[in-house]
Regions:
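Tubulin/FtsZ superfamily GTPase core signature
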Residues: 1-117
Length: 117
């Protein structure tokens, strides 16, 4: 199996761990990063971000986070539309990463992006 990474590349970080990994990986790939999370603490000033709101729930379930991610679909599509390749970084043991990764991957594939996750 071969995979070609086409420029421009977007590194997407999902949740807490994914956001940290994406910020570092974007430096390595000399690309932009996008942080998608339901926790505002995961955002930094260097990256574009999409806040997936799960308010007013304090401890949201995986299902709620996934549903809220689907509600943010148009904003996510706008962010990925300008890139050819997308690298998705997420901690699948965490709620945010496990909830968001399938949704984000599907959006990127529907937009005909080369996806590594």
């Amino acid at each position: 199996m071969t995979f070609e990474l086409h420029e421009p590349v977007l590194v997407i970080g999902l949740g807490g761990v994914g956001s940290k990994l994406a910020t570092e990986a974007s430096k390595y790939f000399n690309s932009n990063s996008l942080i998608i999370s339901n926790d505002e603490k995961d955002f930094d000033s260097q990256s574009h971000s999409v806040h997936v709101s799960t308010k007013p729930v304090l401890n949201p379930s995986v299902q709620l986070i996934r549903g809220s991610t689907i509600q943010s679909e148009s904003q996510i599509r706008d962010e990925v539309s300008q890139y050819s390749s997308v690298i998705i970084m997420a901690n699948l043991a965490g709620k945010s990463g496990a909830a968001m990764a399938p949704v984000i991957s599907q959006i990127c594939k529907e937009e005909n992006k080369s996806v590594i996750s």
